[in-house]
Structures are given as C-alpha cells and as structure tokens.
Amino acid sequence: MAASSSEVSEMKGVEDSSNTHSEGPRHSEEGMGPVQVVAENLDQPEALQSGPDTTAAPVDSGPKAELAPETTETPVETPETVQATDLSVNPGEDSKTCPSPKEACQEPASRPEVNREATAEQGAEQQSAAPPEPTSEQALQLNTQSDPQPTSQPPPKPPLQAEPPTQENPTTEVLTESTGEKQENGAVVPLQAGDGEEGPAPQPHSPPSTKTPPANGAPPRVLQKLVEEDRIGRAHGGHPGSPRGSLSRHPSSQLAGPGVEGGEGTQKPRDYIILAILSCFCPMWPVNIVAFAYAVMSRNSLQQGDVDGAQRLGRVAKLLSIVALVGGVLIIIASCVINLGVYK
C-alpha cells in the first residue's frame, strides 16, 4: 500500500504538469470543450489503478506539450485548472462536477464572439461617421466650376448708352427759318419785316435738318407750341410790321395765287379799283365814292398778305361799283328821255 500511495503522488505531479501544458490546445479548439477534459481525467485514474506502469502518462504529455506553442489565446483562469485536478483526484464525483466545467468553458467561448461583434459594430460606425474622401469633394468642385449654371450667374450686360436727345420736328424748323425768327433762351422772338410783302407761305418739303437742339435745353414741344401761337396771331392781326390789323375776323382759308410768293394753284383776289374809278363818272356819287374806298382797302390788305380780308373788301367794292354804274346809267337815260320828250 505504501508503494501504491507513492505512485499515486507521482502521478498527481505528472498530471498537474500535463494539465498546465494542455490548457492552451484545450481552449484553442472550441469543439473539444470540457467534455473531453472530463473524459481524459476519468480515464487517467483507471490507468493508475490497473498497475504500477506509469509510462502512459508521459507519452500523452508529449503531444500536448508540442501543441502548446501553436495556441494563440491566453490561458484560461486558474479555477478551471483547479477543477480539472479535483476531477482527476476524485473520479467518482464526475457526475456532480461535469456541469460546472461545461458552463465555464462555454462562457470564454462566447466572449470572443461578443467582442468580435462589438468591434465590427464600432468599425461600421467609424466608417459611417468618417468624412467623405477629399477626391469626391474635389471632383464635385471641378464639376461645378466646369458647368456653371446660366441662371445663377448671368453674363454681365454692357451699360446702356444714353440716347441722344430727340431733335426738333422738321416742320417747326422750316417754319422758323421761313419766318426769320430767332431762338433766345427758349423763347421765340419774331423779326420785323423790312418790306411790306405778303406774309408766310408754305415751303416745299425739305429733308430733315441735322441741327442739334438749342443749348438752353428748352424742349422741342414748347418751341413748337410757341411757333404755332405766333403763326395764328399773324393770321389774325396781320404782319407784325403793319400799322394796323386786317378787317377780317376769321383766319385766311385761301392762300395767295400764283403771282404771290409761295402761292401754288390758289385764286388771287382781283383788284376792283378800276371798276370803282369808272363808277365815279356816274351820278351815284356817294355810292361810287364808297366803292372806290373799299377797292383801295382791298388792295392794301392784299399787299400786307391778308388774302381773306382783301377778298372780302374786294367783294364789297365790286358790289358798290356795280350799283353805282347801273344807277348812274339809269339816271342818265331817264334824264335824256325826260329832256328829249319835253322839248318835242
């Protein structure tokens, strides 16, 4: 019995050394698990009880020791090794202690998986939170620079040039030139006529003048209005140089005839002064004298350019001259008849 007890103590030492060497390969292979460890521990006491031959244990420790360098994981906690030694010492209690090594071995196996999942999730979060690559930003900037939107940045327009001021109406310039007027400080000043010839007459169509507007800055509409007012005043009151206005109350409706300057295709008022002189030889002296006066007035109006007044005065002179002539002839005939009949 003493020899058997010494052998048992030696076997325990060998088993302890073999267990420390076999911890690495036992935990590296997850499929092996604690079940195989328990089976090995149960087989070892049977070998001890069979005989004093102890060569089997060292043979098994060799491969286990060779597998130890291949393991990469750290050895498991010491309580597992303690439990394994307890199982080897007390093989009869394997039914009670088997559940605890399985749970202890399953926990370390599940922990690396949890750690791997946690690291994978952290890596995905870091990749999602990482900023985009600078190459993509540079590509976007190049695209935006190469294709600018026309609506966001329209091309600059050249500044509009100031339009030159509008020129005067050519008709107003023709009127001012024909009547001999001057423009001074935006006002129209008519000139005095040196001769007593007929007044304004329409000028033929002339090309548009290239004169610039007056330097005083008066608008062309004001100048045109002033010219029109001056023309209407002349038609009513005669030429500015005349001593008196015309007897006419309405503006002239007919222009001068071919004999008058500017008259084209219009009827010229006739001069009835000769008829008035003939009527003076008739015995209707008050009538023929008035007819002669109207004939002279009609001639003066025609010389001043008042065609309408000359026509009206000429018609009155004609009527009075005819009345004087007819009346004078009748008086002469009546006197002759009376004188000749009395003498017979």
Curated annotation (Swiss-Prot):
Summed up, the tissue specificity of this protein is: Neuron-specific expression throughout the brain, including hippocampus (at protein level).
Per the record's keyword annotation, is Kinase included, yes or no?
A: no
Q: Where are the transmembrane segments?
A: 322-342
On this chain, the residues bearing Phosphoserine are: 28, 242, 252-253
Q: Which residues lie on this side of the membrane: Extracellular?
A: 343-344
- Please state which protein family the record places this protein in: Belongs to the CD225/Dispanin family.
The name of this protein is Proline-rich transmembrane protein 2
Q: Which organism is it from?
A: Rattus norvegicus
